[in-house]
Amino acid sequence: MSDSYFLYHSIGMYPNKARDLAGALAEFAFVWGRPDDGQWAYALGTRQRFIDRWRAILNAPSQSVTTFESVTGAFHALLASLPPGHLRGRSVLVGADCFPSNHFLLQGMAAKYGFTLKTVPLRQGAAHVEDEDFLDHWTPQVGLALLTWISSTTSHRIDLGSMWRMGGAWAALSARISPKGRG
């Protein structure tokens, strides 16, 4: 993996980022190192402001957005929270361009949860799965569709509205993942 991919994939870059980051870390160190009990209120308040900013960007309802250490950890928590048997005998649909660790997770959990993993292939020479190809594979047998809203590797953005409508038509559970800071 090249350094440019790592930087592009993992973190946003902008002018004066180092200065802004140094200031934020200095403020955190000052608060966290004070000899009082205000550290957790500060840290949790900062976290909530971060969540509220993302919620506003996403135009999401109050208390509907949270943070997680990783996309894969969040997706695992979602899978583990499903009612027992929800996926048994059904399919989980993912694109070949989904976050690789989520694909590995699903491969490993298929037997335990009793589902078949269906991976929508890339077209010859394509860097991302086309929306219509994903929709063509979405049948009533799909119990969960993992939608990658914005790909971390190609920046391709799916037509989320079309995907939601399909999920509603089949009464399937859809998980929207956006590993570029939105997931």
Residue ranges and their predicted role:
Residues 1-183:
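Pyridoxal 5′-phosphate
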